A protein has these predicted regions:
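Substrate-binding and catalytic surfaces of secreted/luminal carbohydrate-active proteins
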Residues: 73, 99, 103, 108, ...
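Short, well-ordered beta-to-alpha junction loops that form the rim of enzyme active sites
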Residues: 78, 121, 157
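Flexible loop residues that form catalytic
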Residues: 29, 121, 185
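N-terminal catalytic cores of secreted or lumenal carbohydrate-active enzymes
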Residues: 1-113, 118, 127, 131
Length: 227
């Protein structure tokens, strides 16, 4: 309804004369409240074609890419459609949801995803699923661009880097994960630092709060450790 204001906001956040944000996360959605709203599911039924126009996220990603084509895109999820969780083969069903959503994002908006978050937001880490997703993307042939180039983020845990310890004990898992992300933490433990320094893993503070929003979990990463 207000395209000029909308574009002005996007220019301020992502434009060359603005804040120059470089990354955008888009939720796949499952028609449930995910703490800040309800994002529509891209696939409500197993036999329907994925529809990325139901919510605003993918359209927003496309508009951001018009302003700055170098912005990287990450796809993640807080919950999944019931047909996925009720499936006799949850991993295959979940991958179908991922894959068809990736396909639809490209077909509808020309979006190429740089990252996908494997784990459900702030839930128990499913290492077998992370490995399954990595193998499936790397071997996918029926795709509009090279899905093997999509990097996997794990595990969006809250206040811990537990995934790092699991990775150090499991080479296949370690190889599957490109980015280690944690929420609401002001530190990285020695194992996580080793994975970054010796194994080349990216480390992300992948969710946090600004001081004026929720000061208890907001951190200023300065030399004084002012927190």
């Amino acid at each position: 309804k207000n395209p000029e204001s909308y574009n002005k906001i996007l220019e301020h956040l992502y434009g060359k004369n603005g804040l120059k944000f470089t990354h955008f996360k888009v939720e796949m959605g499952a028609d449930v409240n995910t703490s800040s709203g309800t994002e529509p599911a891209t696939m409500r039924y197993e036999d329907e074609k994925a529809d990325v126009t139901r919510g605003a996220g993918f359209q927003l990603a496309a508009d951001i890419k018009k302003i700055n084509p170098d912005v990287t895109l990450d796809m993640l999820w807080w919950s999944e459609p019931k047909w996925v969780s009720d499936s006799s083969d949850v991993y295959a069903a979940r991958y179908k949801w991922y894959k068809q959503t990736l396909d639809a994002a490209y077909e509808t908006y020309g979006l190429v995803l740089d990252y996908v978050s494997a784990n459900q937001n702030e839930r128990a880490v499913d290492t077998d699923w992370i490995k399954y997703l990595s193998k499936a993307l790397k071997s996918e042939k029926d795709c509009p661009y090279d899905y093997s180039e999509i990097k996997i983020v794990a595990a969006d845990e809250c206040g811990t880097w537990g995934i790092s310890r699991l990775m150090m004990k499991n080479k296949e898992l370690c190889d599957a994960v490109d980015v280690i992300g944690s929420h609401y933490t002001s530190f990285a433990d020695d194992t996580t630092k080793k994975l970054a320094e010796e194994y080349g893993k990216e480390l992300w503070f992948s969710e946090g709060s600004s001081p004026m929003n929720y000061a208890q979990s907001a951190y200023r990463f300065d030399e004084g450790n002012s927190g």
